[in-house]
Protein backbone atom coordinates (compact mmCIF):
# COMPACT_ATOMS: atom_id res chain seq x y z
CA UNK A 1 0.00 0.00 0.00
CA UNK A 2 1.48 3.35 -1.03
CA UNK A 3 0.51 6.42 0.95
CA UNK A 4 1.59 9.96 0.09
CA UNK A 5 0.78 13.51 1.08
CA UNK A 6 -0.93 15.76 -1.45
CA UNK A 7 0.01 19.45 -1.34
CA UNK A 8 -1.59 21.15 1.64
CA UNK A 9 -3.78 24.22 1.43
CA UNK A 10 -4.30 26.58 4.32
CA UNK A 11 -7.84 27.88 4.67
CA UNK A 12 -9.51 30.54 6.77
CA UNK A 13 -13.17 30.06 5.92
CA UNK A 14 -15.72 30.70 8.64
CA UNK A 15 -19.04 28.93 9.18
CA UNK A 16 -21.75 28.86 11.85
CA UNK A 17 -22.59 25.65 13.74
CA UNK A 18 -25.44 25.25 16.22
CA UNK A 19 -24.24 22.57 18.63
CA UNK A 20 -26.87 21.52 21.17
CA UNK A 21 -28.50 24.94 21.02
CA UNK A 22 -25.35 27.05 21.21
CA UNK A 23 -24.20 29.02 18.17
CA UNK A 24 -20.50 28.79 17.33
CA UNK A 25 -18.46 30.61 14.75
CA UNK A 26 -16.07 28.02 13.34
CA UNK A 27 -12.90 29.30 11.69
CA UNK A 28 -10.97 26.83 9.56
CA UNK A 29 -7.35 26.99 10.71
CA UNK A 30 -6.07 24.14 8.56
CA UNK A 31 -7.31 21.91 5.76
CA UNK A 32 -5.19 19.43 3.83
CA UNK A 33 -5.18 16.11 2.03
CA UNK A 34 -2.99 13.85 4.17
CA UNK A 35 -2.98 10.93 1.77
CA UNK A 36 -5.18 9.09 -0.70
CA UNK A 37 -8.82 9.80 0.07
CA UNK A 38 -7.98 11.35 3.44
CA UNK A 39 -8.46 14.96 4.51
CA UNK A 40 -7.74 16.67 7.80
CA UNK A 41 -9.41 19.85 9.06
CA UNK A 42 -8.72 21.94 12.16
CA UNK A 43 -11.36 24.33 13.49
CA UNK A 44 -11.43 27.02 16.13
CA UNK A 45 -15.01 27.23 17.41
CA UNK A 46 -16.11 30.21 19.51
CA UNK A 47 -19.46 31.08 21.04
CA UNK A 48 -20.80 34.54 21.84
CA UNK A 49 -20.54 33.63 25.53
CA UNK A 50 -16.78 33.23 25.18
CA UNK A 51 -16.50 29.46 25.04
CA UNK A 52 -13.76 28.19 22.74
CA UNK A 53 -12.93 24.74 21.35
CA UNK A 54 -10.13 23.49 19.14
CA UNK A 55 -11.45 20.70 16.92
CA UNK A 56 -9.40 18.28 14.81
CA UNK A 57 -11.09 15.87 12.44
CA UNK A 58 -10.34 13.66 9.46
CA UNK A 59 -12.51 12.12 6.76
CA UNK A 60 -11.31 8.87 5.19
CA UNK A 61 -12.75 7.55 1.92
CA UNK A 62 -13.22 3.80 2.40
CA UNK A 63 -13.59 3.29 -1.35
CA UNK A 64 -10.00 4.43 -1.97
CA UNK A 65 -7.94 1.31 -2.84
CA UNK A 66 -4.79 2.67 -1.18
CA UNK A 67 -6.33 3.05 2.27
CA UNK A 68 -6.63 0.38 4.96
CA UNK A 69 -7.47 0.38 8.66
CA UNK A 70 -5.81 -1.41 11.56
CA UNK A 71 -6.33 -1.67 15.27
CA UNK A 72 -2.88 -1.37 16.85
CA UNK A 73 -2.00 -2.77 20.27
CA UNK A 74 0.59 -1.05 22.44
CA UNK A 75 3.91 -2.82 21.75
CA UNK A 76 1.85 -5.33 19.71
CA UNK A 77 1.10 -7.04 23.02
CA UNK A 78 -2.05 -8.01 24.91
CA UNK A 79 -0.82 -5.79 27.75
CA UNK A 80 1.40 -2.80 27.12
CA UNK A 81 1.33 0.95 26.68
CA UNK A 82 2.50 3.14 23.83
CA UNK A 83 1.59 6.53 22.38
CA UNK A 84 -0.43 6.74 19.18
CA UNK A 85 2.48 8.51 17.49
CA UNK A 86 4.93 5.79 18.54
CA UNK A 87 2.56 3.08 17.28
CA UNK A 88 2.23 4.81 13.91
CA UNK A 89 5.97 5.29 13.47
CA UNK A 90 6.79 1.77 14.64
CA UNK A 91 4.23 0.08 12.39
CA UNK A 92 5.10 2.08 9.25
CA UNK A 93 7.22 0.26 6.70
CA UNK A 94 8.01 0.56 2.99
CA UNK A 95 4.72 0.45 1.11
CA UNK A 96 2.54 0.86 4.22
CA UNK A 97 2.61 4.13 6.11
CA UNK A 98 0.51 4.65 9.23
CA UNK A 99 -0.21 8.35 8.87
CA UNK A 100 -3.39 8.94 10.89
CA UNK A 101 -4.64 7.62 14.20
CA UNK A 102 -6.65 8.22 17.35
CA UNK A 103 -6.66 6.59 20.77
CA UNK A 104 -9.00 3.67 21.25
CA UNK A 105 -10.38 1.39 23.94
CA UNK A 106 -10.55 1.85 27.68
CA UNK A 107 -7.90 -0.40 29.21
CA UNK A 108 -6.55 -1.84 32.45
CA UNK A 109 -4.58 0.76 34.40
CA UNK A 110 -3.28 -1.47 37.19
CA UNK A 111 -2.73 -5.05 38.27
CA UNK A 112 -0.33 -7.92 37.70
CA UNK A 113 -0.66 -11.56 36.69
CA UNK A 114 0.13 -14.52 38.90
CA UNK A 115 3.63 -14.51 37.43
CA UNK A 116 4.16 -10.82 38.07
CA UNK A 117 3.62 -9.38 34.58
CA UNK A 118 1.77 -6.07 34.32
CA UNK A 119 -1.83 -6.05 33.14
CA UNK A 120 -1.70 -2.35 32.27
CA UNK A 121 -2.88 -1.76 28.72
CA UNK A 122 -5.14 -4.81 28.38
CA UNK A 123 -8.22 -3.76 26.37
CA UNK A 124 -11.46 -3.80 28.33
CA UNK A 125 -13.65 -4.76 25.37
CA UNK A 126 -13.45 -7.14 22.39
CA UNK A 127 -10.59 -6.44 20.00
CA UNK A 128 -9.58 -7.75 16.56
CA UNK A 129 -6.34 -6.72 14.84
CA UNK A 130 -6.01 -7.41 11.10
CA UNK A 131 -8.23 -10.47 11.46
CA UNK A 132 -6.40 -11.76 14.56
CA UNK A 133 -8.66 -12.19 17.59
CA UNK A 134 -7.05 -10.56 20.62
CA UNK A 135 -10.17 -10.62 22.78
CA UNK A 136 -13.76 -11.70 22.25
CA UNK A 137 -16.72 -11.81 24.57
CA UNK A 138 -20.20 -10.41 24.97
CA UNK A 139 -19.79 -7.10 26.76
CA UNK A 140 -23.09 -5.22 26.92
CA UNK A 141 -21.46 -2.16 28.49
CA UNK A 142 -19.22 -1.42 25.52
CA UNK A 143 -19.74 -0.49 21.89
CA UNK A 144 -17.62 -1.74 18.99
CA UNK A 145 -16.47 -0.16 15.74
CA UNK A 146 -16.20 -3.01 13.23
CA UNK A 147 -14.82 -3.20 9.71
CA UNK A 148 -14.55 -6.33 7.56
CA UNK A 149 -11.55 -7.48 5.52
CA UNK A 150 -12.81 -5.72 2.38
CA UNK A 151 -13.15 -2.33 4.12
CA UNK A 152 -16.87 -2.66 3.66
CA UNK A 153 -19.89 -2.70 5.93
CA UNK A 154 -18.52 -0.52 8.75
CA UNK A 155 -20.82 -0.74 11.73
CA UNK A 156 -20.99 0.68 15.24
CA UNK A 157 -22.93 -1.15 17.92
CA UNK A 158 -22.83 -3.61 20.79
CA UNK A 159 -21.49 -6.99 19.70
CA UNK A 160 -23.23 -10.17 20.81
CA UNK A 161 -20.66 -12.96 20.79
CA UNK A 162 -21.54 -16.64 20.61
CA UNK A 163 -19.37 -19.71 20.35
CA UNK A 164 -19.78 -23.47 20.34
CA UNK A 165 -17.35 -26.37 20.69
CA UNK A 166 -18.31 -29.90 19.61
CA UNK A 167 -16.30 -33.06 20.31
CA UNK A 168 -16.04 -36.17 18.16
CA UNK A 169 -19.00 -37.83 19.89
CA UNK A 170 -21.24 -34.84 19.23
CA UNK A 171 -21.24 -33.40 22.75
CA UNK A 172 -21.36 -29.60 22.69
CA UNK A 173 -20.24 -26.84 25.01
CA UNK A 174 -20.78 -23.10 24.66
CA UNK A 175 -17.67 -20.93 24.28
CA UNK A 176 -17.74 -17.79 26.43
CA UNK A 177 -14.90 -15.93 24.78
CA UNK A 178 -11.25 -15.58 23.85
CA UNK A 179 -8.44 -14.39 26.13
CA UNK A 180 -10.58 -13.40 29.10
CA UNK A 181 -8.83 -12.16 32.24
CA UNK A 182 -9.64 -13.77 35.61
CA UNK A 183 -12.51 -16.02 34.47
CA UNK A 184 -14.83 -16.88 37.33
CA UNK A 185 -18.33 -18.06 38.10
CA UNK A 186 -20.60 -20.62 36.49
CA UNK A 187 -19.85 -22.89 33.58
CA UNK A 188 -17.31 -21.27 31.28
CA UNK A 189 -15.30 -22.43 28.30
CA UNK A 190 -12.60 -19.97 27.21
CA UNK A 191 -9.94 -20.25 24.53
CA UNK A 192 -6.53 -18.64 25.00
CA UNK A 193 -4.27 -17.95 22.03
CA UNK A 194 -0.77 -16.62 21.36
CA UNK A 195 -1.90 -13.00 21.75
CA UNK A 196 -2.56 -13.44 25.48
CA UNK A 197 0.27 -13.71 27.98
CA UNK A 198 2.49 -16.76 27.35
CA UNK A 199 0.34 -18.51 29.99
CA UNK A 200 -3.35 -18.52 30.92
CA UNK A 201 -2.99 -16.83 34.33
CA UNK A 202 -5.79 -19.00 35.73
CA UNK A 203 -6.16 -20.54 39.20
CA UNK A 204 -5.90 -24.25 39.91
CA UNK A 205 -9.01 -26.38 39.99
CA UNK A 206 -10.50 -25.85 36.55
CA UNK A 207 -9.48 -27.96 33.54
CA UNK A 208 -7.14 -26.89 30.74
CA UNK A 209 -5.84 -28.61 27.63
CA UNK A 210 -3.28 -27.52 25.02
CA UNK A 211 -4.49 -27.65 21.42
CA UNK A 212 -3.50 -26.65 17.91
CA UNK A 213 -5.41 -25.89 14.73
CA UNK A 214 -5.91 -28.83 12.41
CA UNK A 215 -4.10 -28.53 9.09
CA UNK A 216 -5.58 -25.86 6.84
CA UNK A 217 -7.83 -24.34 9.51
CA UNK A 218 -8.09 -20.69 10.61
CA UNK A 219 -9.08 -19.19 13.96
CA UNK A 220 -11.75 -16.79 12.65
CA UNK A 221 -15.32 -15.58 13.04
CA UNK A 222 -18.14 -17.07 11.00
CA UNK A 223 -16.49 -20.29 9.82
CA UNK A 224 -16.19 -23.56 11.79
CA UNK A 225 -12.64 -24.76 12.38
CA UNK A 226 -11.10 -27.87 13.89
CA UNK A 227 -8.64 -28.06 16.77
CA UNK A 228 -6.56 -31.04 17.91
CA UNK A 229 -5.47 -31.77 21.49
CA UNK A 230 -1.67 -31.94 21.84
CA UNK A 231 -1.54 -33.14 25.47
CA UNK A 232 -3.69 -34.50 28.27
CA UNK A 233 -5.90 -32.16 30.34
CA UNK A 234 -4.58 -30.61 33.55
CA UNK A 235 -6.19 -29.01 36.60
CA UNK A 236 -2.99 -27.32 37.82
CA UNK A 237 -3.98 -23.95 36.36
CA UNK A 238 -1.86 -21.22 34.75
CA UNK A 239 -0.94 -23.43 31.79
CA UNK A 240 1.73 -22.32 29.31
CA UNK A 241 0.21 -21.44 25.94
CA UNK A 242 2.06 -23.13 23.05
CA UNK A 243 3.70 -20.58 20.75
CA UNK A 244 1.86 -22.07 17.78
CA UNK A 245 -1.24 -23.20 19.61
CA UNK A 246 -3.99 -22.62 22.13
CA UNK A 247 -5.25 -23.58 25.57
CA UNK A 248 -8.91 -24.46 26.09
CA UNK A 249 -10.02 -23.70 29.65
CA UNK A 250 -13.13 -25.17 31.26
CA UNK A 251 -14.77 -24.11 34.53
CA UNK A 252 -17.72 -25.76 36.26
CA UNK A 253 -19.63 -28.16 34.02
CA UNK A 254 -17.49 -26.98 31.10
CA UNK A 255 -14.50 -28.53 32.85
CA UNK A 256 -16.07 -31.95 32.21
CA UNK A 257 -16.03 -31.21 28.48
CA UNK A 258 -12.29 -30.46 28.67
CA UNK A 259 -11.54 -33.48 30.89
CA UNK A 260 -13.25 -35.78 28.39
CA UNK A 261 -10.56 -34.99 25.80
CA UNK A 262 -7.25 -36.78 25.37
CA UNK A 263 -4.19 -36.16 23.25
CA UNK A 264 -5.07 -36.46 19.56
CA UNK A 265 -8.79 -35.79 20.05
CA UNK A 266 -10.41 -33.28 17.74
CA UNK A 267 -13.06 -30.65 18.43
CA UNK A 268 -14.92 -28.34 16.06
CA UNK A 269 -15.27 -24.72 17.14
CA UNK A 270 -17.29 -21.88 15.67
CA UNK A 271 -17.52 -18.21 16.64
CA UNK A 272 -20.21 -15.76 15.60
CA UNK A 273 -20.60 -12.03 16.21
CA UNK A 274 -23.81 -10.06 15.74
CA UNK A 275 -24.63 -6.35 16.01
CA UNK A 276 -28.30 -5.36 16.00
CA UNK A 277 -29.17 -8.87 14.81
CA UNK A 278 -26.81 -8.74 11.83
CA UNK A 279 -23.84 -11.09 11.65
CA UNK A 280 -20.52 -9.31 11.30
CA UNK A 281 -17.11 -10.67 10.32
CA UNK A 282 -14.58 -8.45 12.08
CA UNK A 283 -11.19 -7.83 10.50
CA UNK A 284 -10.84 -4.66 12.54
CA UNK A 285 -12.64 -4.27 15.86
CA UNK A 286 -12.18 -1.62 18.53
CA UNK A 287 -14.30 -1.24 21.64
CA UNK A 288 -15.21 1.83 23.65
CA UNK A 289 -18.14 3.67 25.18
CA UNK A 290 -20.68 5.24 24.70
CA UNK A 291 -22.51 4.97 21.37
CA UNK A 292 -23.16 8.71 21.16
CA UNK A 293 -24.74 8.96 17.68
CA UNK A 294 -27.08 6.34 16.23
CA UNK A 295 -28.88 6.53 12.89
CA UNK A 296 -28.34 10.28 12.75
CA UNK A 297 -29.76 10.93 16.22
CA UNK A 298 -27.73 12.12 19.21
CA UNK A 299 -28.22 9.62 22.04
CA UNK A 300 -28.66 10.56 25.69
CA UNK A 301 -25.30 9.60 27.16
CA UNK A 302 -24.47 12.33 29.66
CA UNK A 303 -26.16 10.52 32.57
CA UNK A 304 -24.00 7.41 32.14
CA UNK A 305 -20.88 8.89 33.71
CA UNK A 306 -20.19 12.20 35.43
CA UNK A 307 -17.41 13.01 32.96
CA UNK A 308 -19.76 12.55 30.00
CA UNK A 309 -21.85 15.48 31.18
CA UNK A 310 -18.91 17.84 31.73
CA UNK A 311 -16.47 19.52 29.38
CA UNK A 312 -13.59 17.11 28.73
CA UNK A 313 -11.11 16.33 25.97
CA UNK A 314 -13.00 13.88 23.75
CA UNK A 315 -12.30 11.56 20.82
CA UNK A 316 -14.82 9.78 18.61
CA UNK A 317 -14.91 7.52 15.56
CA UNK A 318 -17.86 7.89 13.21
CA UNK A 319 -19.44 6.56 10.02
CA UNK A 320 -20.76 8.83 7.24
CA UNK A 321 -21.91 8.71 3.60
CA UNK A 322 -23.81 5.42 4.01
CA UNK A 323 -20.68 3.60 5.12
CA UNK A 324 -18.33 5.01 2.50
CA UNK A 325 -16.56 7.42 4.88
CA UNK A 326 -14.97 7.02 8.30
CA UNK A 327 -14.38 10.05 10.51
CA UNK A 328 -11.95 10.61 13.38
CA UNK A 329 -12.62 13.66 15.57
CA UNK A 330 -10.94 15.01 18.70
CA UNK A 331 -11.80 18.12 20.70
CA UNK A 332 -9.00 19.41 22.90
CA UNK A 333 -9.79 20.27 26.50
CA UNK A 334 -8.61 20.97 30.04
CA UNK A 335 -6.81 23.95 28.60
CA UNK A 336 -7.18 27.75 28.87
CA UNK A 337 -7.63 27.88 25.09
CA UNK A 338 -9.98 24.89 24.58
CA UNK A 339 -12.83 23.93 26.88
CA UNK A 340 -13.40 20.36 25.80
CA UNK A 341 -16.95 19.08 25.26
CA UNK A 342 -19.71 16.83 26.53
CA UNK A 343 -20.45 13.51 24.81
CA UNK A 344 -23.67 14.88 23.32
CA UNK A 345 -21.81 17.87 21.90
CA UNK A 346 -19.18 15.87 20.04
CA UNK A 347 -21.99 13.66 18.71
CA UNK A 348 -23.99 16.67 17.53
CA UNK A 349 -20.94 18.21 15.86
CA UNK A 350 -20.24 14.93 14.05
CA UNK A 351 -23.86 14.89 12.90
CA UNK A 352 -23.47 18.41 11.52
CA UNK A 353 -20.33 17.27 9.70
CA UNK A 354 -22.26 14.45 8.03
CA UNK A 355 -21.90 11.45 10.35
CA UNK A 356 -24.79 9.11 11.13
CA UNK A 357 -23.22 6.85 13.78
CA UNK A 358 -20.43 7.42 16.27
CA UNK A 359 -18.75 5.92 19.31
CA UNK A 360 -16.68 7.86 21.81
CA UNK A 361 -13.23 6.46 22.36
CA UNK A 362 -11.52 6.56 25.77
CA UNK A 363 -11.37 10.31 26.27
CA UNK A 364 -10.15 12.72 28.92
CA UNK A 365 -6.38 12.57 29.26
CA UNK A 366 -6.20 9.74 26.73
CA UNK A 367 -7.64 11.82 23.87
CA UNK A 368 -5.18 11.86 20.99
CA UNK A 369 -5.39 12.85 17.33
CA UNK A 370 -2.21 12.03 15.39
CA UNK A 371 -1.47 12.86 11.77
CA UNK A 372 1.70 12.81 9.72
CA UNK A 373 2.20 14.63 6.43
Question: How would you label these PLM feature ranges?
Answer:
Residues 254-373:
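Extended C-terminal subregions enriched in glycine
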Amino acid sequence: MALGCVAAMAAHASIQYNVRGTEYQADTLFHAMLGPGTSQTSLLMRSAEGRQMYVYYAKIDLTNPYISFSTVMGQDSFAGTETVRSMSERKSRPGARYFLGVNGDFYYTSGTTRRGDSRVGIPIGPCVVDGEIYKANTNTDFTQFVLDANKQNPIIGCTKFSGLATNASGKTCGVDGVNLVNPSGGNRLIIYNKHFFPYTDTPAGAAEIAMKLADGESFVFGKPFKMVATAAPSTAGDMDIPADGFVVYGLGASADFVKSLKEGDEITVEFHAHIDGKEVFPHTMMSSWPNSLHNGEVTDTEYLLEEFGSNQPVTAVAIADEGKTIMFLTIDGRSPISSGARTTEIADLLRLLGATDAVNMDSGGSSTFYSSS
